[in-house]
A protein has these predicted regions:
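Arg/Lys-rich, alpha-helical DNA-contact motif
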Residues: 1-23, 32, 46, 51-52, ...
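Major-groove DNA-recognition helix of helix-turn-helix-type DNA-binding domains
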Residues: 38-57
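Minor-groove-contacting beta-hairpin "wing" of winged helix-turn-helix DNA-binding domains
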Residues: 57-64
Length: 110
């Protein structure tokens, strides 16, 4: 799973507009924005790639960060990649990016 769980309880309203991790989008709105179905988004949750936060009523809420990941998966699937393979590719890309970030940070601060 690609982490995106942050505590947003103490975040001001103005900060939420700029926070790419704030779970602002309902499943329906997220699916509409991505041009996909709610079922596709549920499948990403079932694959443990994206685990949206839940509202008090139990409804899924997606962040912009999660929507970018979902859009990348959709792109791979549209190119003929199986969903499970697309999820694995995204996970590996994320791990590579994180490793590169850690190396760059270490090189900057020996």
């Amino acid at each position: 799973m690609i982490p995106d769980q942050r505590d947003t309880a103490g975040t001001s309203a103005a900060d939420k507009f700029d926070d790419e991790h704030y779970p602002a989008y309902t499943m329906g709105r997220a699916a509409e924005m991505l041009g996909t179905s709610a079922g596709f988004l549920r499948s990403l949750d079932e694959a443990n790639l994206i685990q949206p936060q839940r509202s008090a009523g139990g409804h899924r809420r997606y962040s912009r960060y999660q929507l970018r990941i979902a859009a990348r998966v959709r792109e791979l699937v549209d190119q003929g990649t199986a969903l499970d393979a697309a999820c694995r590719i995204i996970t590996l890309e994320d791990q590579l990016h994180e490793a590169q970030r850690v190396i760059a940070e270490r090189d900057d601060h020996p």
